[in-house]
């Protein structure tokens, strides 16, 4: 490329094109996004794993090690909380964006645990890139999380059911402008130490029972700073170059899910970040036009961990059966998940916010034993249909769900590998969901392994 043709100020001479109005628009690679469409645990890890096989960069854009993704490769089950699960692709770069909050002991512990399981993580430190603008979770954030939960329990008789990973407190520090970022850790350590001491002091005054070994913590952080320094990059420029350089496949794996979003979820029983599509732009520093496909991951029924409204919940044999057959325990907390029928009101709402281009319907095989299957299609309050998903939790707790009953298929689908092989009623169930939501279904999951994802188009 000659010097005259190079776009000024664009890394790699990124291409431009003129619009009809004469303004210059950037064109580049698009990112593919995978998001949870319910309350988490939908099987996002499996969809990401499928797409990550030929990805060049796999990103996390929000949340911390409160997320839990399980990926099975060559019969080895890897658990990811903070690391993008695409890190098991030896040819991809795993990128942790500025919207993610990082607990350094948790990061290294997670990598070491997975290294012991199999070869998937070999050489991970060379494949991980961390935004210098990402905030750091300290041990006292985690301790404060536990104290806050205890206080909620004592004062209100119920807590939020957080993972006690310090996520809420660190996002609070970020919003209060007292947090510390990766760029602070790897720059002047004396300056970092002063700010760390000040933040620790603030936490001590808020929570007098908090014990913080400041010198011990700083010594550990100094060690982490040395280990992590080669991985820390200016995330904005890194992602910009990836978008506007040579063709690349860039994948974003969302953590948590739409109904756990701080703005759009079932507040206050939500996480502390935006886990809808807007969080991808703010958590990576990319413009909306760089977003390509947005895949929503939907479990064939609904689950929720912890407390909060759950209109289609089944506190009965059906819920028990779903729980047992689906092995519904949280990856991060080990807590039993609450189970219920699929809720289309909730999914329409998630689609309004995220604009899914296609869905992955997972765990269809869990429904194999039911003679009839119900699907929540609308909500009523005092006998009147409500046209929207209520923001207020008390209102959501009161809704009556209108169900559509579909016939079950009573056949094992776990070895099915094409849509045509599915039992007739299973096809009808998938078709019903697709038509009601108006979103194409691209994958159907009928088991744990990578091979058990049936691709439709």
UniProtKB/Swiss-Prot annotation:
Pfam families: Adenylsucc_synt. The gene is adss2. GO terms for molecular function: adenylosuccinate synthase activity; GTP binding; magnesium ion binding. Binds 1 Mg(2+) ion per subunit. Substrate binds at residues 41, 331-337. Its cofactor is Mg(2+). It comes from the Eukaryota. Gene3D superfamilies: Adenylosuccinate Synthetase, subunit A, domain 1, Adenylosuccinate Synthetase, subunit A, domain 2, Adenylosuccinate Synthetase, subunit A, domain 3. Pathway: Purine metabolism; AMP biosynthesis via de novo pathway; AMP from IMP: step 1/2. Its main location: cytoplasm. It is found in: Cytoplasm; Mitochondrion. The keyword Signal does not apply. The active site is at residues 41, 69. Homodimer. One of its GO terms (biological process) is IMP metabolic process. Mg(2+) binds at residues 41, 68. Keywords: Cytoplasm, GTP-binding, Ligase, Magnesium, Metal-binding, Mitochondrion, Nucleotide-binding, Purine biosynthesis. This is Adenylosuccinate synthetase isozyme 2. It is an enzyme of class 6 (ligase). GTP binds at residues 40-46, 68-70, 337, 363-365, 445-448. Inhibited competitively by AMP and IMP and non-competitively by fructose 1,6-bisphosphate. Its EC number is 6.3.4.4.
